[in-house]
């Protein structure tokens, strides 16, 4: 196992390039199951979640090859409806997209309940409600979901809560169903449009992706295509926040600025200079920071995935700010770690109250989930002294080549192997 060491206190400057969107990739890769001929996906991020999904597709008979320029080619022609109750499937939160895709193609699936980030209850009841409306019989047996259907028929499905996962999963199951499916109160995230674009290129008939009503007219079969993933707005937002936090000037390249309007607005409100053009955003962090309040909302509101990194930035701002997470109330595991670094933060219910400015101090901290990891990396870059971050497997799930990318901005950051004693201490902590 490795740990990450960061020497803080340097202003970062330069250009950092954003990879393809993790939250798109983990849905686009399972979507290839629905085709009869090979699908090529470009801009695939080199992260552990993607590698694991590729392995799972091979387990069910797919051929997965990696080409030039972050390309992944999936040949689904020999795939079978193999049950996946255990193993890798449980390590991956987004493995639930295999349910919709396998149900859509084979009319049956067995998928172990997913893992990934532990952010309190993330129920999949809306997914199951959608599958049942399409005609599937769904049971939960020994920690795996069993799905079976004689045939799938289009239905009108109203989501009780706006859920990206459920919206995409129902789309995957419905594209080859008989008749029309209407998803009401659908999520509007850019990643949903990305999945709909891939499916449409494969021959699906989908209207309304990106609005709260999506209409799908089922087709008998889908074919391969070539599709390039959108840039990762969460990675981009992380590096925008990092630029503001480090006090230098950072240009984030390969972005769609419209996807980041809520983040741009909050940074400007805090006094950060932000310039946008077609596919770049430049953040200048050398001004005094004003405190702001953050409330996470579904897209186009402020993303829950950037709540933790922004909390770190607020430790540098003058005054007291409140960060409220309306999406995942349990997403405050990073707060204790930031406190070890001298942050003044208290948690009340779904809110964190941050008082600043404080100078963060280097410390030994542990990432408990992906975006907590990003928050701690930013804290390490702001801090006086050396910060040691463990739990890198979480960071590697969603940030491609983070060490090399940050070195390119002038950060002093490196990985080291952990000793047996350190691994034991971490497990017991």
From Swiss-Prot:
The modification 2-(S-cysteinyl)pyruvic acid O-phosphothioketal is found at residue 117. Phosphoenolpyruvate binds at residues 22-23. It catalyses: phosphoenolpyruvate + UDP-N-acetyl-alpha-D-glucosamine = UDP-N-acetyl-3-O-(1-carboxyvinyl)-alpha-D-glucosamine + phosphate. It comes from Bacillus anthracis. Cell wall formation. Adds enolpyruvyl to UDP-N-acetylglucosamine. Keywords: Cell cycle, Cell division, Cell shape, Cell wall biogenesis/degradation, Cytoplasm, Peptidoglycan synthesis, Pyruvate, Transferase. Belongs to the EPSP synthase family. MurA subfamily. The gene is murA2. This is UDP-N-acetylglucosamine 1-carboxyvinyltransferase 2. The keyword Cell wall biogenesis/degradation applies.
